[in-house]
A protein has these predicted regions:
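Right-handed parallel beta-helix/beta-solenoid
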Residues: 16-47, 51-67, 359-363
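Solenoid scaffold repeats with emphasis on beta-solenoid/beta-helix
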Residues: 48, 83, 90, 100, ...
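Feature marks extracellular polysaccharide-active and adherence modules
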Residues: 51, 93-95, 113, 121, ...
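Right-handed parallel beta-helix/beta-spiral solenoid domain characteristic of secreted/periplasmic
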Residues: 52, 56-63, 69-136, 157-159, ...
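Acidic glycine-/aspartate-rich tracts in secreted/extracellular proteins
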Residues: 53-56, 96-99, 307, 334-340, ...
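Extracellular beta-strand/beta-solenoid scaffold signature
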Residues: 64-83, 104-111, 132-142, 162-176, ...
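Predominantly extracellular beta-rich ligand-binding scaffolds that present long acidic/polar faces
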Residues: 239, 247-370
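C-terminal accessory segments
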Residues: 352-402
């Protein structure tokens, strides 16, 4: 009897596997230009391989029934999309990351809607066009009510602007119900936030370069959630920000050379800021920005901030514009910030493991620690490095650190 049950179980598995393999197809697009036709033709679960050529989308206007960043969410928005994946799951993979190019010519470049298990990888997304409606959450990739893995994608040069709208075209935006897994992407020279998350969106963002844009490198708003590990955020107006009632965990990021602030939390947001390097930002490095924001700031190196004339916050390392009692602040190196290391809070040096000394990087903008660095083995005693020793302060400390 047991053998018969086992045999029946194995037959059932074989039948399931066979059914899946029969139902899922791989479609290769290497000629022509109508990628959307292939997307429309593909069935749920199919894979589309995009050849090494440029594909130009024919943009289509539509009315977005919800507004991502309006006070009244049910505000209709006039927008456009280049490619749309709707009510099914697809894997869209380029055959050459640099040469498989999707030029979207639209506000919502690649738009995932009600797509429960899709993936986008190994290609370039470029050429977005700003919509005239300022409420449109334009970005190279936009997802709503979708689970999308976005790996090894170059999101570049979506920099079209129009005079009547301040915002431009961003990099990757999560809308209502989006669950995004963004890894090893190069998001550069776009016209608004690098990554933005709106109502009900969540994202895991790892090992990305987010560079040279307007807005924030990573902006998390409303009730969105974000975990960001090992990213470089540079050349934006602002670095990594938590707004509204959002929840952000930001570990081991290099937030450097942005025009305004480095990392802030405002509204009623929670932010866990650990093992980051916040270096050479134009105004303040790190700031609790409201009395209701809360979180933890530990194991960070906050240095050389304040090189620019004051714009959005004082030119200091740490600015307290909130309720300091709601923040755990310890084991940080805060040093050499232009107008002081601290503002609107007493000097934290030699309190809770905080120090104010040269962290001892091996070179300019190379944040590896020298062997004699005061940051080695002096981090939070309850945070361990990958080898089990007490954590280092900075990028290469803690369990999420990248090995060098």
């Amino acid at each position: 009897m047991r053998m018969e049950k086992k045999a029946g179980f194995l037959i059932a598995i074989i039948l399931v596997v066979c059914c899946v393999s029969v139902q899922s197809a791989t479609l290769t697009v290497s000629r022509g230009n109508d990628l959307q036709a292939t997307i429309d033709y593909a069935s749920d679960g199919d894979t589309i391989l995009v050849g090494p050529k440029e594909f130009e989308a024919a943009p289509r206007a539509f009315v977005d029934s919800l507004c991502g960043n309006c006070t009244e969410q049910k505000t209709p928005v006039n927008a456009s999309y280049g490619y749309i994946i709707k009510n099914k799951s697809l894997t869209i993979m380029g055959l050459d990351r640099a040469e498989s190019i999707l030029t979207t010519n639209a506000g919502y470049g690649i738009f995932f809607v009600n797509s429960p298990n899709s993936a986008l990888g190994n290609l370039t997304v470029t050429g977005g066009k700003r919509d005239a409606d300022g409420n449109a959450t334009d970005a190279a990739v936009v997802a709503r009510n979708s689970n999308v893995h976005i790996h090894n994608v170059d999101v570049i040069n979506n920099d079209h602007r129009i005079d009547t709208v301040i915002v431009g075209v961003g990099g990757i935006f999560g809308r209502e119900g989006a669950e995004l897994y963004i890894k090893n992407c190069h998001i550069e020279n776009n016209g608004w936030d690098g990554i933005a998350l709106y109502r009900g969106a969540s994202a895991l963002v790892t090992d990305c370069i987010i560079k040279n844009g307007r807005g924030a490198g990573i902006g998390v708003t409303w009730d969105a959630t974000c975990v960001a590990y090992r990213n470089i955020v540079t050349g934006y107006w602002k670095g990594i920000g938590a707004f509204g009632t959002s929840w952000v965990v930001a570990h081991n990021n290099a937030v450097i050379d942005n025009l305004g602030w480095g990392m802030i939390a405002t509204g009623s947001a929670f932010m866990d800021i650990a093992n980051n390097v916040v270096h050479h930002n134009g105004n303040c490095g790190v700031a609790p920005w409201s009395s209701e924001s809360r979180g933890r700031i530990v194991n960070n190196i906050i240095t050389n901030n304040g090189w620019r004339t004051e714009w959005v916050c004082p030119c200091v390392g740490v600015w307290n514009y909130g309720d300091w009692a709601k923040w755990q602040f310890g084991y940080n190196i805060v040093w050499n910030n232009k107008e002081g290391n601290y503002r609107d809070i007493w000097d934290q040096t030699d309190i809770n493991g905080n120090i104010s000394v040269d962290p001892g990087f091996v070179g300019e903008s190379v944040f590896i620690l020298r062997d004699n660095s005061p940051a080695i083995d002096t981090g939070h005693p309850e945070i361990s490095d990958q080898d089990g020793t007490r954590s280092d302060i900075g990028l290469y400390g803690g369990p999420q650190a990248k090995r060098h």
